């Protein structure tokens, strides 16, 4: 708050969740030049508006598969999206969760002024980032000024390890919880982020996933469910997903996108049970054609209710990964 005010900026906060009905009129009124959002917002725009349009017919799908045509279509769509955001946007900062690869590729090819920031509440918060003119697909950028980053417990084969940080903005510790504080700091005082990552030769950070979410495959492979979920969520009929391990197999819990179902299947509500299994198989085949061998899913299980999420729109994974994926349950949103 203090910094933008000191620069003469006007700051606008939404007092309700940023649904399309809330966000669109606000953008038209405010016409922001700088905007900070969680990935879910831009992912929904990409899936429901951009991708849905370019996969709506055989003609569009054929064009979209051609590299130079896809880039051209993304550029045209990006100009329209800029108008939706008010036409004055210079910086769209995205953070709080991992951005879907398809959505980021669209932003990059559309030449949209976006950048991804990486940080935690405990580091107040920025650790790495880049300017919109410098972004690289899949990377959060180099360490921010005044921040040092390194990897701990690096796997010699993958070159990946836990990201640890040293910065003046890091917290001193958790309030009246010395045990938790001790766990998140190395012996030489660096903060353990709990995230797995790797660096390029010139120091750009690529985040692979949460250490606690990583699944160890049958032959010792490191499987990152977030990467599989990114592919799952790029399917036009998938709204959200969680990948979990069950009895040595990877199972995908999927909440389907009802708008996409309506567009793809006439009268889908009346005939859902008859074609649901075919759709599940379609999703399995779609994912397994795009991931490596040990990240292939064996099954899709429908999650009829929306996933329970945090205020920053992250799925509360622990509610789903610790139970039998076939278990019927009722969960209220929190």
Give, region by region, the residue ranges found by the protein language model.
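Generic structural signal for well-ordered beta-strand positions
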Residues: 158-159, 200, 206, 223, ...
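AMP-binding/adenylate-forming catalytic core of the ANL superfamily
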Residues: 167, 173, 196-293
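Conserved AMP-binding/adenylation subdomain of ANL enzymes
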Residues: 1-79, 88
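Conserved AMP-binding/adenylate-forming
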Residues: 11, 35, 72-205, 211-214, ...
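Active-site-proximal glycine-rich helix-loop-beta segment
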Residues: 8, 195, 317
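Conserved C-terminal "lid"/linker of ANL adenylate-forming enzymes
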Residues: 240-248, 282-334
């Amino acid at each position: 708050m203090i910094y933008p005010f000191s620069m003469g900026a006007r700051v606008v906060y939404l007092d309700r969740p940023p649904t399309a009905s809330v966000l669109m009129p606000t953008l038209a009124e405010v016409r922001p030049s700088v905007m900070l959002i969680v990935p879910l917002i831009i992912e929904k725009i990409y899936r429901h508006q951009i991708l849905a349009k370019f996969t709506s017919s055989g003609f569009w799908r054929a064009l979209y598969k051609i590299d130079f045509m896809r880039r051209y279509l993304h550029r045209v769509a990006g100009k329209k999206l800029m108008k939706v955001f008010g036409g004055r946007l210079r910086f769209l900062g995205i953070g709080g969760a991992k951005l879907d690869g398809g959505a980021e590729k669209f932003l990059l090819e559309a030449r949209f002024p976006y950048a991804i920031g990486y940080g935690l509440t405990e580091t107040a918060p920025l650790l790495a980032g880049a300017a919109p003119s410098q972004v690289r697909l899949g990377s959060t950028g180099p360490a921010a000024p005044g921040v040092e980053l390194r990897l701990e417990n690096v796997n010699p084969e993958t070159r990946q390890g836990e990201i640890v940080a040293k910065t003046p903005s890091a917290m001193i510790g958790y309030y009246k919880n010395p045990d938790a504080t001790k766990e998140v700091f190395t012996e030489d005082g660096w903060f353990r982020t709990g995230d797995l990552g790797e660096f390029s030769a010139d120091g750009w950070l690529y985040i692979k996933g949460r250490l606690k979410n990583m699944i160890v495959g049958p032959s010792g492979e490191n499987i990152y469910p977030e990467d599989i979920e990114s592919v799952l969520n790029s399917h036009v009929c998938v709204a959200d997903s969680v990948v979990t391990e069950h009895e040595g197999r990877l199972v995908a819990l999927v909440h389907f996108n009802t708008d996409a179902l309506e567009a793809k299947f006439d009268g889908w509500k009346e005939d859902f049970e008859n074609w649901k299994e075919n759709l599940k198989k379609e999703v399995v085949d779609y994912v397994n054609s795009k991931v490596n061998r040990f990240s292939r899913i064996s099954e899709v299980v429908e999650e009829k209710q929306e996933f329970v999420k945090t205020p920053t729109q992250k799925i509360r994974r622990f509610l789903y990964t610790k139970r039998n994926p076939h278990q019927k349950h009722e969960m209220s949103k929190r």
